[in-house]
């Protein structure tokens, strides 16, 4: 069994790390490079950076901080935001990113997944999915342009259909951002993760809802995810990564 991954997530806007609740009302957390350094030193397995308004603003990621991050950390990192072409991705890899993640651009142009996977290999291509549970219908929908709440919209894709589609097109990993749980620290949506896990034959990363160490344990044991991504609990030092890994080892979970 592969070791499970602990992945801090850094949402970036205007050159700063920010954090919202259910993708709204973002507060500034701090500067990108020192936070990245801190997490690498604390034992994170990987980092994910989302330039959250790049897609909704119609631009690509500011590459200057990507290069600075690559210079100061020695763990893999993934960047996302407004990547619409092989050329966009090429520049980010040249600046030191290990993986790229696409979300809204893939919904606008699903063939982008194929082109990126063909060019860079599936292992370098992550697809982020922003899911929203609609209580009235009991359905999980895929949302787009979630970095800007005024432009966020529900697509015609239901979650499980999109999960199948992105795998067929060459995604090497899926990060499932469960918007209903985001930032509220009540735990990952285990039922949703199980539904996706049953269909997902590539690494699956849970995102949205971590508030206590047991939430990570539940995602790993009950939903068998490959990694757990979290933001506010790490940013605000509610959970220490080293202590979290010790706890998970005691729970017999294989951790790096």
Swiss-Prot record:
GO cellular component: cytoplasm
Any GO BP: L-histidine biosynthetic process
Subcellular compartments: Cytoplasm
Catalysed reactions listed for this entry: 5-[(5-phospho-1-deoxy-D-ribulos-1-ylimino)methylamino]-1-(5-phospho-beta-D-ribosyl)imidazole-4-carboxamide + L-glutamine = D-erythro-1-(imidazol-4-yl)glycerol 3-phosphate + 5-amino-1-(5-phospho-beta-D-ribosyl)imidazole-4-carboxamide + L-glutamate + H(+)
Pathway connected to this protein: Amino-acid biosynthesis; L-histidine biosynthesis; L-histidine from 5-phospho-alpha-D-ribose 1-diphosphate: step 5/9
One Pfam entry name: His_biosynth
GO molecular function, one term: lyase activity
EC number, as in UniProt: 4.3.2.10
Domain of life: Bacteria
Active site: residue positions: 11, 130
Keywords annotated in UniProt: Amino-acid biosynthesis, Cytoplasm, Histidine biosynthesis, Lyase
Family named by the database record: Belongs to the HisA/HisF family.
Assembly information from the UniProt record: Heterodimer of HisH and HisF.
Cited function: IGPS catalyzes the conversion of PRFAR and glutamine to IGP, AICAR and glutamate. The HisF subunit catalyzes the cyclization activity that produces IGP and AICAR from PRFAR using the ammonia provided by the HisH subunit.
Name the record gives this protein: Imidazole glycerol phosphate synthase subunit HisF
């Amino acid at each position: 069994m592969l070791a499970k991954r602990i992945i801090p997530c850094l949402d970036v806007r205007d050159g700063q790390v920010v954090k919202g609740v259910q993708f709204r009302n973002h507060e500034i957390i701090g500067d990108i490079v020192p936070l990245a350094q801190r997490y690498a030193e604390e034992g994170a397995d990987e980092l994910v950076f989302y330039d959250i308004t790049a897609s909704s603003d119609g631009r690509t990621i500011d590459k200057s901080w990507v290069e600075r991050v690559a210079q100061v950390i020695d763990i893999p990192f993934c960047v996302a935001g407004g990547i619409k072409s092989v050329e966009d991705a090429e520049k980010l890899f040249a600046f030191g990113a290990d993986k790229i993640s696409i979300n809204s651009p893939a919904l606008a142009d699903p063939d982008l997944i194929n082109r990126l996977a063909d060019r860079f290999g599936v292992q370098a291509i992550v697809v982020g999915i922003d899911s929203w549970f609609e209580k009235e219908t009991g359905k999980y929908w895929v949302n787009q342009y979630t970095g800007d709440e005024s432009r966020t919209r529900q697509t015609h894709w239901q979650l499980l259909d999109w999960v199948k589609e992105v795998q067929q097109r060459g995604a090497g990993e899926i990060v499932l951002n469960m918007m209903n749980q985001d930032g509220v620290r009540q735990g990952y949506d285990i039922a949703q993760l199980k539904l996706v896990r049953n269909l997902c034959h590539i690494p699956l990363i849970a995102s949205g809802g971590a508030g206590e160490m047991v939430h990570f344990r539940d995602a790993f044991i009950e939903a068998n995810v490959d990694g757990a991504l979290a933001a506010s609990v790490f940013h605000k030092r509610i959970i220490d990564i080293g202590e979290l890994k010790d706890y998970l080892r005691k729970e017999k979970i294989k951790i790096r």
